[in-house]
């Protein structure tokens, strides 16, 4: 918690020109009344569900149990639905956020918040930037940062202020200096800061509790809206390093670090979650949680673009969550954590074996990535040409740089999908490549 609370009551200041103009779709706004008892709808242009050729969907899980979606549940999945998501799934995800981030009930007076389901968190981010950022605005990010976000931001001709990081993420002193010495005659003062606090992509850094408090305090002081993009939140390893290998172990309390949302006293955090890393990336289910006023604008934008996330994907997730309950969900998260911890350790072993003394890196405590600093001035040609010739795929640091005109010594390696043997062979090939480069 910060010493002083600067509670936000009016979010107009944070909206882009387009965001301020966003209005509800007249037809979509009627959806909320369609389920009222006795309501006869002649308003919506919904296709008649009796014409759909699907009778039921059956999915077998890896533990042998089954999900069956049929009847009214299947009809709901295949029909147009409210933009924020299927109501029962939206409630289940709100319950998850309350449980995991210690949130108040969503309708508590003065603290009203909401949750909107989207086609993956990438869509949520794009929607948020649409209603928050104007062309030629300033925005603060970590440097390096997620390439997918840069792909959204760079075409807007923004002043992207990349703040240096250390092993715990964005350095507060660097952020404080940037804001306190801002030249208002050159650039618009930023309203938004974008952060990836856990298992940062690409650097693998994770903010500890004090770092989050320090960053939050500065954002409160300078009235910045925080975009907390946290797809690797459930891939934190510290709670798994001493866990038993029993995949049936009870995990009633996941030992995960406090999120920025959980410490938000001002109402300045928009949190973005994803099920891609923990259930399935192909389901394309993400969700954004935050102040009701801001989410209303995001909802209006989504009404005019994709309408809503896939009803079928939502129905599958809802059926799974209902079958699992809290305990089984926690067990699955614990399994995911142990799985990626083992993959990380496999890569660390191969680095110690083949790359010792050749690269610099920090051991990640969350996520899927290791960020190497190489003994070369620019990794781009080395990776795009030489590494490809040796049949190893890595990503050069320039792909994640807020300033792509400057060379980068860094490379991102992912340990998520390759086997132990493939990881070892790839790291060996990479070491051979570096040794050859250093001999030139």
Curated annotation (Swiss-Prot):
It is found in: Cytoplasm. Transmembrane segments: none annotated. Its EC number is 2.6.1.57. It holds the Pfam family Aminotran_1_2. The modification N6-(pyridoxal phosphate)lysine is found at residue 277. GO terms for biological process: alpha-amino acid metabolic process; biosynthetic process. It catalyses: an aromatic L-alpha-amino acid + 2-oxoglutarate = an aromatic oxo-acid + L-glutamate. Its cofactor is pyridoxal 5'-phosphate. Keywords: Aminotransferase, Cytoplasm, Pyridoxal phosphate, Transferase. CDD domains: AAT_like. InterPro entries: Aminotransferase_I/II_large, Class-I_PLP-dep_aminotransf, PyrdxlP-dep_Trfase, PyrdxlP-dep_Trfase_major. It comes from the Eukaryota. Its main location: cytoplasm. GO terms for cellular component: cytoplasm. GO terms for molecular function: aromatic-amino-acid transaminase activity; pyridoxal phosphate binding; transaminase activity. Belongs to the class-I pyridoxal-phosphate-dependent aminotransferase family. PANTHER family: AMINOTRANSFERASE, KYNURENINE_ALPHA-AMINOADIPATE AMINOTRANSFERASE, MITOCHONDRIAL. Has aromatic amino acid transaminase activity. This is Aromatic amino acid aminotransferase DDB_G0287711. It comes from Dictyostelium discoideum (Social amoeba).
